[in-house]
Amino acid sequence: MVNILPFHKNNRHSAGVVTCADDVSGDGSGGDTKKEEDVVQVTESPSSGSRNNHRSDNEKDDAIRMEKISKNQSASSNGTIREDLIMDVDLEKSPSVDGDSEPHKLKQGLQSRHVQLIALGGAIGTGLLVGTSSTLHTCGPAGLFISYIIISAVIYPIMCALGEMVCFLPGDGSDSAGSTANLVTRYVDPSLGFATGWNYFYCYVILVAAECTAASGVVEYWTTAVPKGVWITIFLCVVVILNFSAVKVYGESEFWFASIKILCIVGLIILSFILFWGGGPNHDRLGFRYWQHPGAFAHHLTGGSLGNFTDIYTGIIKGAFAFILGPELVCMTSAECADQRRNIAKASRRFVWRLIFFYVLGTLAISVIVPYNDPTLVNALAQGKPGAGSSPFVIGIQNAGIKVLPHIINGCILTSAWSAANAFMFASTRSLLTMAQTGQAPKCLGRINKWGVPYVAVGVSFLCSCLAYLNVSSSTADVFNWFSNISTISGFLGWMCGCIAYLRFRKAIFYNGLYDRLPFKTWGQPYTVWFSLIVIGIITITNGYAIFIPKYWRVADFIAAYITLPIFLVLWFGHKLYTRTWRQWWLPVSEIDVTTGLVEIEEKSREIEEMRLPPTGFKDKFLDALL
């Protein structure tokens, strides 16, 4: 067997070490076998000496890990290895050659159940539970439903593409390898990665502000006695405290927040199904009544077939806010979760069920319980009513004669907004961390404490998210719409860059003959990614099409629709000029690094898999399949 250790990305012929193993000899009877390993130094890379110096330390760590896991395998009741043992041992600080301790790393404190629940509900916030009211009113039930199907079809290939790249090289805890900016820097171009990183950062902090703004409005459903600024302060402080804590605290909080959101949405879908068949207190069988009267499409711009098309297209632009950060959040956890390849692959595969069940079925449920011209809905949107006051689910439930449930749903909306803000804060800090580690942001932002928290990045993200205080002097609806519009286009640009990174990654994989070593492969690539890239590119350019109709022209809407594009281009071209790399707009395939760290992660994954015991019994098999 021949293993080629990582080589430098700028020289395909500077590979460091070639190992030849498994030379088998024995007598004719097949008795003893002899395994020899010859190590041949071909050309020493700068990092090979460091590997040799640390070999004894690494062997010692491996021995400790094997001993701890063997002692505790019997304690695992579901037949799988203990993830907490892996994370506790792998990322312990070991002494360096000169006696100093190594820099602190991110801790792999996220277990399988954390990653799976984050994948299912981590980024679901007010966009689905409240934001759909505006889309329903503007586009009609069919426009809402069809647009969410199209967005889901566009998003899933992106999730698969990011999952493939991150599962291949998930990082070792010293960086946030799963961030889209890091992938773009590594596989496309550092300048484009620079623009992508800062684009994502201000997208994330704006989303933190947007969700905290929405959460403050949700509380106003119950009382207006307390000023908005007080609620914003409370929500921001709780989010910051959770992100200043160890990552396992974040994972645990998101696990329970996501569980509440999932149970809430499942309950609302079931209740909508009951109302569909007339099971409410008034026994009014709804069916698809509202698809016929007032109609399936709202025709907000024009009538006929063109009106149907514009309703769907507007629904895509408006509805995309509910999907922002969904794929990225799953991959950003890769450097901080145990058994990285297995957990990220599982989360990526199951992402489709989140799209189908929550978004597609959720919007179908909304479309059958509320007409797009419902007086309560129209009045709530006109007055900017917060929280449950403008939620289409709540309006439909109230129309059915159910009294108490709206308050419960408002509580779920509050936890959803809070949870989404928590997730966006996590993403913003990891985005800053990645840029600091790749030289695209001040190095101080990359400082990590002994608990594995990038504390400087958390502090900076908190300061930027104080944009939420703009809500104190403006209505919740106006500020929320501004934030959502700007962050949605930033999300579009990030998705496009992720698609480009995957296409370059795929070329490099085939160039180096590594396709068979991909641990996670998805159907239809690269064609599905090309589909997503083209669709998102068209939407990004035309997202403000309606404002060019004279009667809809507003300068504020034009700025919100297109301000992100020049900012992104200035970041990209400015970095090119600053680094004087304008002659090369993307890395040649021969220079794309798809090998550094590959052997190590493959060996680690193989060790984990060999120690994994298959689940026994129905309960263990069910939990293994679920989480």
UniProtKB/Swiss-Prot annotation:
Q: Which residues form the signal peptide?
A: none
Where does the record place Basic and acidic residues bias? Answer: 54-70
Region Disordered, as annotated, extends over 19-77
Q: How does it sit in the membrane?
A: Multi-pass membrane protein
User: Glycans attached where?
Assistant: 72, 78
Q: Name one GO cellular component term.
A: plasma membrane
UniProt keywords (A-Z) are: Amino-acid transport, Glycoprotein, Membrane, Transmembrane, Transmembrane helix, Transport
Q: Does the keyword Transmembrane apply?
A: yes
One function term, GO molecular function aspect: neutral L-amino acid transmembrane transporter activity
Query: Coiled-coil ranges per the record?
Result: none
The Polar residues compositionally biased stretches are 42-51
InterPro entries listed in its UniProt record: AA-permease/SLC12A_dom (IPR004841), Amino_acid_permease_CS (IPR004840), Amino_acid_permease_fungi (IPR004762), APC_YAT (IPR050524)
Gene Ontology BP annotations:
amino acid transmembrane transport; gamma-aminobutyric acid transport; neutral amino acid transport; proline transport
The source's superkingdom equals Eukaryota
Residues that span the membrane, as ranges: 115-136, 142-162, 191-210, 229-247, 262-281, 306-326, 351-370, 408-427, 455-473, 483-503, 522-542, 558-578
Q: What induces it?
A: Requires the presence of GABA.
Cellular compartment(s): Membrane
The protein's job, in short, is: Required for high-affinity proline transport. May be responsible for proline recognition and probably also for proline translocation across the plasma membrane. Also functions as a non-specific GABA permease. Can also transport alanine and glycine.
Identify its protein family.
Answer: Belongs to the amino acid-polyamine-organocation (APC) superfamily. YAT (TC 2.A.3.10) family.
Name recorded for this polypeptide:
Proline-specific permease
Instruction: Give the organism the record lists.
Output: Saccharomyces cerevisiae (strain ATCC 204508 / S288c)
State the gene name recorded for this protein: PUT4
